């Protein structure tokens, strides 16, 4: 049986929303809600942070937490340091966004299934855009990266631009005429692959698009893609939190 550990990178010093992991959501800090959403579908879960306030909050609700450097450029780097400190013994590390308190356990199961294929090195998730999605706020939104897949459900490219370009049709006809995929920022890596990719220098495409997964593709790694119909709600700003609290109240 393969063993899966979920690591939740959590920084206090967010530019747009300082202290975000500790933001109160109906009596629980957001980081606790993320932790509780995923803990039953993984062999182990751990928060990786660089801030003692987050460490204390996780310990207070009985979660596992590891202190990491404040110099990491990405959540992937923080995951690898945490994995080294926890001690090895897991086959796959799942990198879980600390600002998605409604992440669905089914999404974790979908990404785990990708590793039934012994050749899977890295896996991530996508969600198809709906044909009735608002074009401007969905497909045109650079904060919602798009993905194109090959016949083996591997990522060929990720972009903040719209890919593919539909020639000969008006923009308004694009969504009904083609299945576009939105990237969901959940990753999983085999342990050895995680070690390798954290040692790669930043790549030209990564710097151009500001998408770290392009570094892996540029260096020849394959990214298996699981398809989910579950929507995720990422919280980047205090305004996003207001919407999330309204969603929580209506559940």
Curated annotation (Swiss-Prot):
Gene Ontology terms for molecular function: 3-deoxy-manno-octulosonate cytidylyltransferase activity
Main location: cytoplasm
E.C. code: 2.7.7.38
GO biological process, one term: lipopolysaccharide biosynthetic process
Reaction equation(s) it catalyzes: 3-deoxy-alpha-D-manno-oct-2-ulosonate + CTP = CMP-3-deoxy-beta-D-manno-octulosonate + diphosphate
Localization of this protein: Cytoplasm
Pathway: Nucleotide-sugar biosynthesis; CMP-3-deoxy-D-manno-octulosonate biosynthesis; CMP-3-deoxy-D-manno-octulosonate from 3-deoxy-D-manno-octulosonate and CTP: step 1/1; Bacterial outer membrane biogenesis; lipopolysaccharide biosynthesis
Recorded superkingdom: Bacteria
KW Nucleotidyltransferase (keyword) present: yes
Keyword Disulfide bond among record annotations: no
A Pfam family that the UniProt record links to this protein: CTP_transf_3
Enzyme class of the recorded protein, top EC level: transferase
An annotated GO cellular component: cytosol
Matches recorded under InterPro entries: Cytidylyl_trans, KdsB, Nucleotide-diphossugar_trans
Keyword annotations of the record: Cytoplasm, Lipopolysaccharide biosynthesis, Nucleotidyltransferase, Transferase
Membership in a protein family: Belongs to the KdsB family.
NCBIfam families recorded: kdsB, PRK05450.1-3, PRK05450.1-5, PRK13368.1
Job description of the protein: Activates KDO (a required 8-carbon sugar) for incorporation into bacterial lipopolysaccharide in Gram-negative bacteria.
Protein name, as recorded: 3-deoxy-manno-octulosonate cytidylyltransferase
